[in-house]
């Protein structure tokens, strides 16, 4: 199936932002490519034929209604980033898809926190390099490093952890 115009635009804007971030990191753009894991998580790699073995930073890219967000982290760590419009309302019927037990009860009583929990869990899914193969209901945010903040009209969450640790 062909990608929609919107999807292509999101992809391209994310890649342009990633290029800027990689350039600001001080890496040569002509020697690096973006590859994907089996779960479609992006990562940087030296282009075949470039004889460098220094580790590359971990990366994550996200999109939201015309915005692109990107995060880089020092080698040896995994990172995930997610963003949503800060005024986006998560419908209460979606709460059971993203939380259970005490967390679900908290969400029901504090529905304004839903966007923070939603973006935090999406960031964790990306940092774990498992994407949607990690059920958000099974993510206990207390077990992860997550920072959330507002930038313009976006609510952004970033999660990171040591690569390969369980």
Describe the role of every protein-language-model region.
Residues 1-166:
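Core catalytic alpha/beta fold that binds nucleotide/phospho-ligands
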């Amino acid at each position: 199936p062909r990608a929609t115009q919107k999807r292509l635009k999101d992809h391209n804007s994310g890649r342009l932002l990633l290029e800027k971030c990689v350039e600001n990191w001080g890496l040569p753009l002509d020697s690096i490519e973006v590859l994907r894991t089996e779960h479609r998580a992006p990562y940087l790699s030296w282009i075949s034929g470039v004889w460098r073995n220094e580790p590359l930073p971990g990366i994550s890219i996200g999109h939201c209604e015309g915005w692109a967000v990107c995060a880089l982290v020092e080698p040896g760590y995994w990172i995930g980033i997610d963003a949503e419009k800060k005024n986006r309302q998560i419908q209460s019927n979606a709460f059971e898809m993203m939380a259970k037990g005490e967390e679900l009860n908290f969400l029901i009583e504090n529905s304004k926190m839903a966007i923070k929990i939603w973006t935090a869990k999406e960031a964790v899914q990306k940092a774990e390099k498992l994407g949607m193969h990690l059920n958000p209901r099974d993510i206990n945010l207390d077990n992860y490093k997550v920072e959330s903040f507002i930038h313009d009209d976006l609510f952004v969450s970033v999660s990171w952890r040591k690569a390969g640790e369980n």
